[in-house]
C-alpha cells in the first residue's frame, strides 16, 4: 500500500486514503495505538473543500500526535456512504474506531477547536506509528 500526499502540498502530513481497505487499516492502527484520527471528506471539484486543504495541513503539521486523513468522496464512496457524508467538506474526529465529533462545512475555526480539544482530552503526545506496506 502506498501513502499519497495531497496534490499541491510538498511534505504533507495528511494521508490521502485511496480505498476502503486503506481507511480500515489506518483507523484500526491509530485506534490500537490510542491515537485519534481527524478525517477530511472532500472532493476535487468542491471549491469550499479545497479551500480547507491548507488549514487542514497546517493542523496536521502542528499536531503530529493525531492521524490526519483526506478522503475524496468520489474515490472512496463506500467510506463516505458508511459515515453518511452528504456535503463537502465534512470533518470527523474518530477515537477507538468511533465518530466522536462531526463538522459539516468549511469552518476552519471550528475544525481547529475540535482538533485542539481532542489533543488535550485524549492526552496523546507521540505521533501514531502507522505501518505502510
Curated annotation (Swiss-Prot):
Any idea where the Thioredoxin domain is? 1-120
Sorted alphabetically, which InterPro entries does this protein's record hold? Thioredoxin-like_sf (IPR036249), Thioredoxin_domain (IPR013766), Thioredoxin_H-type-like (IPR050620)
This protein's source sits in the domain of life called: Eukaryota
| A Pfam family matched in the record | Thioredoxin
> Which family is this sequence assigned to?
Belongs to the thioredoxin family.
PANTHER family (alphabetical): THIOREDOXIN, THIOREDOXIN-LIKE PROTEIN CXXS1
Question: What is the protein name stated in its UniProt record?
Answer: Thioredoxin-like protein CXXS1
Organism equals Oryza sativa subsp. japonica
Amino acid at each position: 500500500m502506498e501513502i499519497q500526499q495531497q496534490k499541491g502540498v510538498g511534505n504533507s502530513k495528511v494521508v490521502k486514503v485511496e480505498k476502503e481497505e486503506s481507511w480500515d487499516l489506518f483507523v484500526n492502527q491509530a485506534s490500537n495505538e490510542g491515537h485519534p484520527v481527524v478525517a477530511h471528506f472532500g472532493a476535487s471539484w468542491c471549491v469550499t473543500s479545497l479551500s480547507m486543504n491548507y488549514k487542514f495541513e497546517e493542523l496536521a503539521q502542528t499536531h503530529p500526535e493525531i492521524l490526519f486523513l483526506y478522503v475524496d468522496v468520489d474515490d472512496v464512496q463506500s467510506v463516505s456512504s458508511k459515515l453518511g457524508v452528504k456535503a463537502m467538506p465534512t470533518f470527523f474526529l474518530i477515537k477507538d474506531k468511533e465518530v466522536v465529533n462531526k463538522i459539516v462545512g468549511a469552518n476552519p475555526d471550528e475544525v481547529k477547536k475540535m482538533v485542539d480539544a481532542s489533543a488535550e482530552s485524549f492526552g496523546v503526545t507521540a505521533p501514531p506509528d502507522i505501518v505502510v506496506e
